[in-house]
Structures are given as C-alpha cells and as structure tokens.
Amino acid sequence: MLRTRLSVSVAARSQLTRSLTASRTAPLRRWPIQQSRLYSSNTRSHKATTTRENTFQKPYSDEEVTKTPVGSRARKIFEAPHPHATRLTVEGAIECPLESFQLLNSPLFNKGSAFTQEEREAFNLEALLPPQVNTLDEQLERSYKQLCYLKTPLAKNDFMTSLRVQNKVLYFALIRKHIKELVPIIYTPTEGDAIAAYSHRFRKPEGVFLDITEPDSIERRLATYGGDKDVDYIVVSDSEGILGIGDQGIGGVRIAISKLALMTLCGGIHPGRVLPVCLDVGTNNKKLARDELYMGNKFSRIRGKQYDDFLEKFIKAVKKVYPSAVLHFEDFGVKNARRLLEKYRYELPSFNDDIQGTGAVVMASLIAALKHTNRDLKDTRVLIYGAGSAGLGIADQIVNHMVTHGVDKGEARKKIFLMDRRGLILQSYEANSTPAQHVYAKSDAEWAGINTRSLHDVVENVKPTCLVGCSTQAGAFTQDVVEEMHKHNPRPIIFPLSNPTRLHEAVPADLMKWTNNNALVATGSPFPPVDGYRISENNNCYSFPGLGLGAVLSRATTITDKMISAA
C-alpha cells in the first residue's frame, strides 16, 4: 500500500523545529475516494491508500463533495478527531486517486524512489522508476549531497524550489534536518534575489494568480484550488513592497510561497491546506516592464477606485470560497498596507505581517534587551529610522505594550521618534505624511535650529535607548552615529533590520567594534557570531507562524491587538 505519512512534530520555537516529518509505520484510517469523479470509466480503481496526518478540521461526520489539493473532485468521508483534541492534525489514511505520471507529478503524494515494489505495481510506476527502493533517509542523503554541489545561495534556492514542486515530504524533511543552513536559503535573505529573478528562473507555477483586468474571475480562480473546508491559511501580496527591494510585480508570489513554507515548518499547517495568492495589479518597476521575459502585467500599477474594487471583490471571494481561512497580508505598499488592514481586519481573521508581525518580534527583542540591562520600558526612548509599514508597526506595538503597562498613550507616543527620507517627522510635515505617521510627529518649535535631516544630530538630541533600522539604506548607521548613541547609553540597543543583507543599516561586527562589544544587536537576517557573541535575529518567522497557528486552531473570527501582543 502507498504509505506516505505527513506528521507534525511540536518542538521548541526557538529552534524552529515544528516541522513536517515523514513516517511509514502509521495505522491506517481510510478516506474512500470515488474514482469515477476523477477519471473516465476505463480508469482502474485502486484500493491502495496514502496515509498522512491532516490538518485539524471541524468534526465533520457527513459525506460531502470537495476538491482535493491537487485540484480534482473527490468524495471524502471525514472522521472526527478525539473529543478533547487540541492537536492540529488528525491521523488517518486516504485512498490515492492518482497513478503513473499523474502520481509522480503530484508533490503532495509523490515519494519518488521511496515507492515500494508493491506500490509500484499498484500504481503503474514500475516502468517509471529505477529498480532500487530508497528510504527517506537515503533520499535525504542524496538530496543534501546534490545541494552541497551548488556554490551560490541562489542556486541552492533554485534546487529547493525544484524539490518543493516534486516531493513536499522530502522538501520539508530536508529543511528540518538542516534547518539553520536552509531557512536563509528558502527565506530571507536569499528569497529576495529569487523573487527579483522570478520570470527568468520560472519552472513550474505555484499558487493562484489574480489579474486586476479580470476582476469577475476572482471567485472562480480561487475555487480552482479547493472547496470551503480545504484551506486553512492564505498569504496574499500585491508585491509592491517586497523584502526591502520594492515593487517586484508577479514575482511577489514567491514571498507568499516562502511564508507558507515557514507556516508548515514552524506552525505545523499542512502544506496541502495553504494557499499563496498574487494580486497582479501591474508594476512600476521599469526594469520588469521592459523585460520581454517578464510574466506579469506590464502596465503601471493601477490605484484608486479600480484597485479598491478589485481588493473588495477578492475579500468577498475569500469569505465565500474559504470562509474559515486566516488571511495574511504580505508586502503591500505603505499607502495600502495599513488602510487595507484596518478596513478588513474585522471582516475576516486577518493580519498584516509587515506591520503586526514585525512589531511583535521587535517588541519581544526589546523586552529581552531591557530585561538584560535592568531597564524599564516606561523610560525607553526609541528612534526608528524608516517610517514605512514595518517602522510604523514597530512603533504601534511598542506604544500598545506601554499602554498595557499603565503608560498613557499620548505619553507613550512621545517616546517614539520616526525618521523617513525627509528626516525626523515633524508636525509641519502633515501634508506629506500619512495619518499613521503623523500621530508620532514632533513639535517644530522643540526642534528649531537642529538639523532634523541628519541622523547623527537626531541621535544626539533624542539620546535613544534603542535605534531601529528599517530604511533599506545600507550603511546608514555610521560609526559617528553609533558612537554618539554610545556616549549617552552604555548598553545601546541597535536593531538593523532591513532585508536583504546587503541593505542592512550596519553589520554586527562594526556595531560591536564601535561600542567595545557593549551593543545589544539583533538583525533582520542571520549573521555569524562576533567575538563569541551570538547575534540575535529579529525575523518575522519567530512571530507569524505561532500567531497563524493559534488563529487556525481557535477558529478566531478576528485577530486583535491583544493577540498580537500576546504573540
């Protein structure tokens, strides 16, 4: 029998080992599949089964027709979990409706060389595979050796992409076994380069593509993937603000894919029950628009009413097609990210990772740093260099946390200082700042005579406890800026967070050198230790998987600010 079992292990979040594993010894619980709905009448019926742990579902006992994750209609009988189950998954078996090339081309079911001889006979695979049967461990050894032959991170990213679209069990098992090495390959910082080169390195489509020129097709396109109980988690992006590298058009689907890979690795959501969605509304990236190989719409980004109507239809379609799914907004531009979150967060369980996820993980790091140095959050002054979605999310999360600890909101906002390309945000900038930025604007009179465009001068006057960088301005935290901060702060807390790595405001080695190893540093991408000091990583992958998992398990109807703070 075909025995490909996917199970979820729960382990310490700090080690990122909630991940997909494989086993071939699970007891079977069958989900019969009606073959006639999948193939013509001359397709032979198989009694062999595929076993796997399936993500937690409501306890359905009735028979119903749904679409499978491979896009075909099938009749399933769902078995209820144990009465007091709090686990994400339910063990069981399903009959596999696929055979031959169709089975080998389904990444959710394909086992490659691990199909047993019995399975090869039952599923018409004998002529399609070499005779030797491999274990998963042998497949892992072969795959890792192939990976090690590759010299560049981007080449390794290509290899992992190819593996993901062939065999998801092997893909997740390989990452789990080499997680410290491979997360930077499948996620930041390497994924940014893969996104930028998407149309040139394209191999096989993944996810759902929604075209703003065909808004009436949204519901039909979403329904291509499955039915109302087939999807737990959706990541959607319009690709305007990708990972610090800006507008990447159709390539933004890759950020949704990589986020969902982490949802499986760290949150335990089944890879067949997640959905990456790309909203193609055009691109303002002139390089992409001139590229004859670019695969998306080449017209300029559509904004205004047409854009809003398109988003409205998308939200309504999600609520109708996948009513229980959590919606994760990812890498929208600064003009749209916050307003879309505020508009739709109470219509369906949704959150914006750039705003709320970033804020949560930075808040956690700040709390840890203050605790380490015996300082109080109420006395903390934070200077955020970069006032986009991430910077504002960090500011809001710090303020919310202060408020929950008894600080007046107005007083809390006075302790947050924002800088953008014009310098420190002042009240006179109201016409050129967003409402979310303006609540942190400082009085022009208080800053009269000070060069508010100079980071050094602002640091000299603010005397920040914590300096946060999300500006994508490489090298912005210069030696004189850091030394000025260190004059007033014996243990400066410095978070250069911009991604990819080449856009970091400073590298940890310099920060430690300029502060005589006194700085408390956390970065947005992984860095090696400095003089024996381990560099912490302020990455969203430490926040959104747990938040998403909690929302899926609880069937939350709204993701509140208190839930973000708890995360």
Predicted feature descriptions by range:
Residues 1-27:
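N-terminal chloroplast transit peptides
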Residues 442-532:
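Rossmann-like adenosine-cofactor binding region
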Residues 109-110, 353-357, 370-373, 492, ...:
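Adenosine-phosphate binding glycine-rich loop
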Residues 347, 352-466:
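Glycine-rich phosphate/diphosphate-binding loop of Rossmann-like nucleotide-binding domains
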Residues 221-223, 244-255, 286-293, 337-343, ...:
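Short acidic, glycine/serine/threonine-rich loops at helix termini
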Residues 8-13, 31, 42-44, 49-350:
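N-terminal ligand-binding/catalytic initiation module
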Residues 95, 241-243, 463-465, 542-550:
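Short acidic (Asp/Glu) and glycine-rich catalytic loops that position anionic groups and cofactors
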